[in-house]
Every structure is written in structure tokens, then in C-alpha cells.
């Protein structure tokens, strides 16, 4: 299979899976294994296509991101979504990521650990659906600092490969009495700084594996993941309010079984 086709397929996988509660890591490892695209070059490629998905969110939520630069609501102590909400949502995962980055990359990016993450994340999502209570926050401006911090703490679970950032944060939001749409949007916003930091750190360590010959392949993957991520996020927000997290949880369990059959056995 040509590099361009491989890039196109993996770009679609990344764009679909990055911001959905189904684990982009698990999908990329499984599909990469089936395509025979593995090793350091593959890891560097995954970093690049993640940047495409990140850019999609940055564009979709550019107005909200720009508004976070306005510190007046924060200084006036207005009950309005502001940069401190994002800080509370980001800080726990940043600390966890910095402390555990090398351990995670060395020991946890293994097929069997990803299977554990897929199943554990599915259990959390089902638990959140069963235990969720009537929402008190129906928009980002309703979000309290306590709710933001709670979701931020749940984001720490996503440092474990296969757990899913969206799955853990949306579950945390439901348990903190935040509705689906608001939990999802906050999940996307707090994912940006964490992903930019983690991806940037990985890219600094991996850029030596790149060559000029890789540019066409990496460009196709980047553009594909960007376009697909934009479409996936818009569709997901509409779908989630209708079907909830359980179908995604069941899909994760199915993926864990497929992962075990095709990768581990």
C-alpha cells in the first residue's frame, strides 16, 4: 500500500477518533498494525496528524478562544465563562502529563495496556450515564469553577493510553451535573492546550525521524485529519444529546475485543 493511501486512511481515523469518546490511540495502533505502518516513523506521523485535529478545534471555537483573552469578566468576578475555567480544566492534566510523560511513553504505549484503557474507559462512561443527575449547567457560561476542576481531574485519566480524553472528561462533566453539549465543548477547549503541549514535546523529540521525502505523506495525513475532525465534532455534538455515551462505550468494548484478536493473539 502506498504511503499516500496509508496517510489518507490514518488521517480519517485520527479525525474521527480524536475528539470522540472512542480513543484515537487505540484506533491508530490497531489500524497502523493492520496496515503494517509501525515504528518511530509511524509515531512521528501520528503526532503530525494530531496537529491537524487540533487546528480543527481551534478554528471551530476561535471566537470562544479569543474571548478567553478578555480578563474583564474574571476581574469583575462575573459569572461568565473565562480563562480561569480553562486553567482549572487544564492544570491537573498538565501536572500529570509532565510527571508521567516518560513513563507513559516507555511502558504504557503497549497493545495490552491500550486494551485495558479501552475497557476501563467504557466502564467509566456507562457508570457516568447510570449515575448522572439533573444537569445544573446548560452552557459554558453556567459552568462553575468546581465543575471545571472536576472535569480537569477526570482529564488526568486520559494520560493512560486508550482511556480517551473525550470519554473521561465528558463522563466527569455528567457526574458534575453538566449537560452533554457543555461537557463536550469544555472537553474540546481544555484538550487544546494539553494536546498542543504534549504534541509539541513529542515532536521535539521525534523530528529527527523526518525527512524531505516524508512531506507529501505527512501533508495528506494532516489535511485529512483536519477536515474529518471538523465534520466529526459538529456531528458528534448533535448525536451525543440523542444517544448518550453508552453506544460509544459498547463500541469501545467491541474495539478491545478486535484489538485483542488482531494485535495481541
From Swiss-Prot:
GO terms for biological process: cell wall organization; peptidoglycan biosynthetic process; regulation of cell shape; response to antibiotic. The gene is uppP1. GO terms for cellular component: plasma membrane. The keyword Cell membrane applies. It is a multi-pass membrane protein. It is found in: Cell membrane. PANTHER family: UNDECAPRENYL-DIPHOSPHATASE. Bacitracin is thought to be involved in the inhibition of peptidoglycan synthesis by sequestering undecaprenyl diphosphate, thereby reducing the pool of lipid carrier available. Its EC number is 3.6.1.27. One of its GO terms (molecular function) is undecaprenyl-diphosphatase activity. It holds the Pfam family BacA. This is Undecaprenyl-diphosphatase 1. The chain crosses the membrane at residues 4-24, 42-62, 84-104, 108-128, 184-204, 217-237, 245-265. Catalyzes the dephosphorylation of undecaprenyl diphosphate (UPP). Confers resistance to bacitracin. It comes from Bacillus thuringiensis subsp. konkukian (strain 97-27). The keyword Transmembrane helix applies. It is an enzyme of class 3 (hydrolase).
